[in-house]
Amino acid sequence: VHTFGWYMRKYVRETRARGATAIICSLVPRNNWKDGKVFRSADSWALWAKQVAEQEGAYFIDLNELVAAKYDALGETAVKKFFPADNTHTNEEGARLNMATVMEMIRKIKPGSLAKYLK
């Protein structure tokens, strides 16, 4: 068993070895709120993902912050509907919001090359 960072570096290297573009995404935030804002885990998983991306020269999409900002704009009551079973796993509607965020950022990272694969 290895660390989160070890596995992320391994995935980046394996991706590149196959000629693909490595993109690391931080985890999306859980449905945890304080003072009207969703909690960001900027000092653990999101930070570690960003550090590996920087160390390996991979693209990084900070879903923790990007999705949290969207959740904040929607509000706690609306976002609660995305998490019917627990505060970690979204339903399809929540997954679609996350997916739209990833697609939006892929279009910005390397215009043209990866965007052609997105609908």
Residue ranges and their predicted role:
Residues 1-96, 100-118:
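Alpha-helical cap/lid subdomain in secreted, periplasmic
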